[in-house]
């Protein structure tokens, strides 16, 4: 391949898998899957890709099983802008996965995590109670934040508020992390804004 980056580790069926974001020599995005039984020696076992090319590079791969549905999380680069979709220079979302990481695997249609700007490099973690939580980077490496007063003062980009992922009737749902409710207090009425 031309470009490989962003390793992510996944444990499944007693084996350790390493996912790598990649760009093929034909300028097509994919995720490479390597398998290990001892955590030191890995062998390439799969290349995850869509039936039709989807971008020229997939960064930041991750893998999560949400309510029984496996998802490949990725940040495809080079997706043409549409009226209400793909407004970021690079995208962040997931592909529903059918099949094992190391075998015959089919990826479903890409689902964007966010239609706003500046959401990238999402990562999941599993809470003690089994919920799958999603964090993203509020920033784009190639964006010019020079006109932002925060950036001029040395504050630039941040992590997003965590989200809970749910798979309901064949669709991805995202909700704010329920623990955030503890941060709420009595409402404050603000006068007329000008």
Language model features by range: what are they?
Residues 1-26, 31-34, 44-52, 60-64, ...:
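Hydrophobic core segments of beta-strands in well-ordered, beta-rich domains
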Residues 1-11, 20, 41-62, 102-122, ...:
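Surface loop/turn signatures of beta-propeller and other carbohydrate-active proteins
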Residues 5, 29-32, 44, 59, ...:
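Residues that flank catalytic or metal-binding motifs in active/ligand-binding sites
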Residues 24-29, 84-91, 155-156:
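Short, solvent-exposed loop/turn segments at conserved positions within beta-propeller repeat blades
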Residues 26-28, 52-54, 80-82, 116, ...:
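A short local loop/turn or secondary-structure capping micro-motif enriched for an aromatic residue
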Residues 35-39, 97:
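Conserved Ser/Thr-centered positions that define the repeating blades of beta-propeller domains
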Residues 66, 76-78, 83-99:
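Acidic, glycine-rich loop-and-beta core segments that form the ion-binding/anion-interacting portion
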Residues 90-192:
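Beta-rich accessory regions
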């Amino acid at each position: 391949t031309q470009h490989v980056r962003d390793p992510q580790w996944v444990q499944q069926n007693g084996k350790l898998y390493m996912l790598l974001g990649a760009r093929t020599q034909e300028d097509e995005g994919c995720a490479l899957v390597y398998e290990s039984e001892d955590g030191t020696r890995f062998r390439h076992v799969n290349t995850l890709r869509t039936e039709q090319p989807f971008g020229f590079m997939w960064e930041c791969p991750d893998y999560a099983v949400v309510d029984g549905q496996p998802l490949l999380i990725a940040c495809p680069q080079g997706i043409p802008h549409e009226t209400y979709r793909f407004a970021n220079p690079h995208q962040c979302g997931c592909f529903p996965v059918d099949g094992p990481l190391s075998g015959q695997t089919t990826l479903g249609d890409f689902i964007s995590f966010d239609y706003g700007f500046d959401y990238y490099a999402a990562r999941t973690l599993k809470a003690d109670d089994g919920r799958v939580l999603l964090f993203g980077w509020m920033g784009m490496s190639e964006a010019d934040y020079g006109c932002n007063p925060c950036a001029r003062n040395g504050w630039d980009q941040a992590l997003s508020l965590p989200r809970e992922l749910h798979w309901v009737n064949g669709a991805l749902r995202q909700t704010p992390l329920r623990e955030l409710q503890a941060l709420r207090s009595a409402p404050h009425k603000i006068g007329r804004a000008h």
